[in-house]
Curated annotation (Swiss-Prot):
Record GO cellular component, one term: ribonuclease P complex
One Pfam short name: Ribonuclease_P
GO biological process: tRNA 5'-leader removal
Oligomeric and partner information: Consists of a catalytic RNA component (M1 or rnpB) and a protein subunit.
Gene behind the chain: rnpA
Top EC class of this enzyme: hydrolase
Protein name as it appears in the record: Ribonuclease P protein component
Family: Belongs to the RnpA family.
InterPro entries in the cross-refs: Ribosomal_Su5_D2-typ_SF, Ribsml_uS5_D2-typ_fold_subgr, RNase_P, RNase_P_CS
Role: RNaseP catalyzes the removal of the 5'-leader sequence from pre-tRNA to produce the mature 5'-terminus. It can also cleave other RNA substrates such as 4.5S RNA. The protein component plays an auxiliary but essential role in vivo by binding to the 5'-leader sequence and broadening the substrate specificity of the ribozyme.
An example molecular function term from Gene Ontology annotations: tRNA binding
Lineage, opening ranks: Bacteria, Bacillati, Actinomycetota, Actinomycetes, Micromonosporales
Keywords on record: Endonuclease, Hydrolase, Nuclease, RNA-binding, tRNA processing
Region Disordered, residue ranges: 39-59
Length: 136
């Protein structure tokens, strides 16, 4: 189980991570990763140096999106539990203050635990990698 400080619970937190983070899809998961310092803190009137210090001292946080397309409530909760357990093992490897949203695609219900882990690892690694230039 993730601690309360490690969970995303407000819709504004989810929206900020999805809109401002890097989106990478691998297999049956789509990961939205926001690293510290990439999102401006518009709700604070403090100087920028103070907000940056607060962001980096906060733990990495994670949230999950499992839609009804994945299955009924039993299936969705099973997928969410497996993803939560996988993310709990990987969260300490993310920089402090980062935000991770994991979205399960409909075929995630039929994936094994090991395969979900492989997909999640690949997506997180791709999201953390520096952006390369695209050739046209």
């Amino acid at each position: 189980m993730l601690t309360a400080a490690q969970r995303l619970r407000r819709s504004t937190d989810f929206a900020a991570a999805v809109r401002g983070g890097r989106r990478v899809g691998r297999g049956v998961v789509v990961v939205h990763l926001t690293l510290p310092g990439t999102l401006p803190d518009v709700s604070s009137s403090k100087p920028a140096r103070d907000t940056g210090a607060e962001q980096t001292s906060a733990p990495a946080r994670a949230g999950f999106v499992v839609s009804k397309a994945v299955g009924n409530a039993v299936v969705r909760n099973a997928v969410r539990r497996r993803l939560r357990h996988l993310v709990r093992e990987r969260l300490p490897g993310l920089p402090a203050g980062s935000t991770l949203v994991v979205r399960a695609l409909p075929t995630a219900a039929h994936r094994s635990y090991q395969r979900l882990g492989v997909d999640l690892d690949a997506a997180i690694a791709a999201a953390r990698a520096p952006r390369g230039r695209r050739s046209r």
